[in-house]
Amino acid sequence: MSSYQSINPANNQLLKSWPSHDEAAVSQALDVADRLFHSSWSKGEIPPRLQVLKKLADLIDSRAEELATIASKEMGKLIGQSRSEVKICSQIARYYAENAEHILQPQSYPSELGEAWVEYHPIGVLVAVEPWNFPYYQLMRVLAPNLALGNTVLAKHANIVPHCADVFEKLVREAGAPEGAWTNLFISTDQVADLIADDRVQGVALTGSERAGSAVAEQAGKHLKKSTLELGGNDVFVVLDDADLDEAVRQGVQARLSNCGQVCTAAKRFILHEKIADRFISQFSAALSAATLGDPLDEKTTLGPLSSADARDRLVKQVDEAVANGAKLVTGGKAVDGEGCFYQPTILTGITPDNPAYYQEFFGPVAQVYVVGDDQAAVALANDSHYGLGGSVWTRDIARGRKLASAIETGMVFINSQSDTSAELPFGGVKRSGYGRELSDLGIKEFANQKLVVVAG
């Protein structure tokens, strides 16, 4: 039987191993989840489920430091950023605990056919396939709305964060959720495909790579199952000539280095107006070069390791290929010698459309910088991408910012702020960044049977 290993990317030391789930265990988990869906837990009144979410939020808060430390050791996130991730998880749980009942109230529709309304009901067992970069937050985005609604979930987490997956499942059970409400499975891609094909599974949610999303969408489509996908992003950070440059640089550094750049909504393509480009690049380069690399548990560290040796090696290959095809290195550009999976903060300029890097997502501390002459060119460059997840625009003229935000082809745009997230706001993208929305009132309705009822008269 294969195992899932927890390895500290700061020093490459093995922390612990978990055995994978065999076919019998997966079959049993599906049986339990399906039975629970057909019970009063899912079909009955909502308050008992909301009480579990309230308890879960309290548990997360009470064990915040423990949870943050586990994540930082397992995937290399700075301890302060892990604490922030844990905090947003309790916020999401509380948001749905406090708002789900109102959101799911029947909605009236005026009609000549009679009294009409739409009710919201759970649809059944879901499969969730989630990544390692936010090992709790990604799970909570699926758990909280679907637990409130009454769907049951079988979760396949990324294989490099088994400890986070295991402790999350235990927290859900400790909060009072019955067996089958949320089940963690250490399984293969083939086993995921088999689950999606099972008639008892009614939907699948995936956050991950474009390749993984395409495979899941194909399998879901083959069996006519609802799916939502949150995939890669190549988000823009547009700095116009009237922007608060110091603040744009400060947040630009955060937006590129947070989680060692391993964020779908991280700023990756910096589009600068030519009037401020040289000043921005100078300040930005100095700030990136001043990053303190080290142990993510050390409060003084400002840039931790990449999540794994594979992640580091992919980034090395990407940057080397970009430079070989004409990109210019302003700073950085190499892996850091010694133990751990560290990579230098890097700026690339001079990337042309014939360079493969032009359309690639760099999942690490690498910033692509482009210079444009006007707003129209900024929008054209921003939209010349296969992806459409998020982005930000920096300007003192809010009307100008609104115009650009409306024209940029993404699911989310922030004006005078780096991309962010909050439980009450929808999260999702367009193009190859996926489809569907998570969080907010939209997220809880993705896997709901939106049932029309009409009383003729």
Question: Where on the chain are the PLM-derived regions?
Answer:
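Structural signal for hydrophobic packing residues in well-ordered secondary-structure cores
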Residues: 34-37, 41, 57-64, 68, ...
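Rossmann-like NAD(P) dinucleotide-binding subdomain of oxidoreductase/dehydrogenase enzymes
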Residues: 105-247, 372
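Conserved C-terminal structural/oligomerization subdomain of aldehyde/semialdehyde dehydrogenase
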Residues: 11-17, 201, 292, 335, ...
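Short, well-ordered beta-strand elements within core beta-sheets of diverse protein domains
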Residues: 15-21, 37-42, 128, 237-240, ...
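Short loop/turn microsegments at loop-to-beta-strand junctions
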Residues: 1-4, 267, 389
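Residue-level signal for inorganic ion chemistry
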Residues: 12, 49, 71, 93, ...
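N-terminal Rossmann-like NAD(P)+-binding subdomain of aldehyde/semialdehyde dehydrogenases
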Residues: 1-114
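ALDH superfamily catalytic-core signature
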Residues: 176, 211-352, 415
